[in-house]
Amino acid sequence: MTAARVVSCGASGIDEKVADWVPLEPGDEPSRGASLAMLGGAGGVAVLLVELAAGGVVAEHTTPDVSVCHVVEGGGTVFFPGGDEIAFERGDTIEFAGDVPHGWRGGSERTLLAVTTYPEDSVKAAA
């Protein structure tokens, strides 16, 4: 694996053809309209893309370590247990402490592409 990789991110967003997209499997709470692609990693950081269609949902989940999500395209809400929600839009960056339950809900007609990075060891442990 190379230490660096260029992903096209022009005016139309990330080139979806650079990755192998995998639909998220429903867990206890169903995910729908969501796909995940692993782009690779270097220096202990894994890079993933999450595609969330308008109205799509990524079910509530946790990551073992801190995770950072940059919203590349689209918008929606992050939801938490107890009903709390945070709205997000293109250009926002959201950080989650480890083991904080949260989920994603697409809100616009556009597809959301989010780039998420977190320690590679936590990705392997969760798999």
Language-model regions: role of each:
Residues A42-V45, A53-G56, G75-T77, E120-V123:
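Short, charged/polar surface micro-motifs in flexible loops or helix N-caps
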Residues A53-T62, S67:
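Catalytic core of non-heme Fe(II) oxygenases with the double-stranded beta-helix
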Residues V68, E95, E109-A125:
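A short hydrophobic beta-strand segment most commonly corresponding to one strand
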